[in-house]
């Protein structure tokens, strides 16, 4: 059974994903999948901001583990290892999600879709596969896999995103 969580400041957390035993169950993983994918497809900026606050810990981070080729080449040119790209906190996460929306969803070319339901990996870790699907013909323009670490309130503490090929 999913139960709501209330912080001492009396802010309701109705989207809590952990059960009374602090384990991720099928219902929690389904909810996580739906909310996470909805966030990246959401057209309304205020709704995106609200979803980020519901899904993510205040200091939550997303780490892009395999940055775009031009960034990898620039790092290699100055003898640096390939860098991870990290955004932290609700404001930076909002900017990251908004930019992805503007690039891929707003033009009407793609939509993000889950590749099944998130899977419990270990403890409070979940893995979520997704695809960027063409609205024109249903072809896959790209895929990814996110490893999400949830905090004690069931919000995302960290998200390590691995971008895959189409």
Predicted regions and their residues:
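C-terminal and inter-domain tail/linker signature
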Residues: 5-7, 17-166
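Short hydrophobic transmembrane-like helices used for membrane targeting/insertion
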Residues: 1-3, 11
């Amino acid at each position: 059974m999913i139960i709501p969580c209330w912080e001492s400041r009396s802010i309701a957390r109705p989207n809590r994903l952990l059960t009374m035993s602090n384990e991720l169950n099928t219902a929690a993983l389904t909810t996580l999948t739906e909310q996470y994918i909805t966030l990246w497809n959401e057209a309304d900026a205020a709704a995106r901001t609200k979803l980020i606050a519901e899904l993510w810990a205040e200091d939550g981070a997303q780490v892009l583990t395999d940055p775009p080729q031009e960034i990898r080449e620039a790092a290699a040119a100055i003898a640096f290892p390939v860098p991870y790209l990290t955004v932290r906190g609700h404001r930076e996460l909002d900017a990251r999600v908004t930019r992805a929306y503007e690039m891929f969803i707003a033009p009407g070319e793609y939509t993000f879709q889950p590749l099944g339901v998130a899977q419990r990996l270990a403890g409070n870790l979940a893995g979520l596969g997704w695809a960027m699907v063409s609205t024109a013909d249903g072809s896959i323009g790209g895929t990814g896999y996110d490893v999400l670490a949830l905090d004690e309130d069931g919000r995302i503490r960290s998200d390590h995103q691995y971008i895959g090929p189409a």
